[in-house]
Amino acid sequence: MFSMNRNPRIVCADGFSMSVQAFSSSYCLPRQDEGPHTHMEGGFPSSPPLDPELLESRENAYEGNEGDPCETVYPYVAREVFEREFELHGGIVEGRLPY
């Protein structure tokens, strides 16, 4: 059975969690299965992200959409932005960023 969720959900020390994916049919750069990837697709965080640049990536992608920040995808986010977000939550305790 095919699963679109190829990379396990990342969980941080404070309980924050988020899906981060990088493969040919996700919003990543380069848009291929093999890494390294400079930008990745995040999605469905357990609470609104803290990093302003991560929030901005969603706002830029879905201009005018004021929907729930926990029920959406964050496209083409730089690896460094995800690293900062996870550090703001005490660091990764489960999972890892895609390569």
Kindly give the residue locations of the regions a language model identified.
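Short secondary-structure subsegments characteristic of cysteine-rich extracellular domains
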Residues: R31-L54
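Amphipathic, interaction-prone secondary-structure segments
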Residues: F2-T38
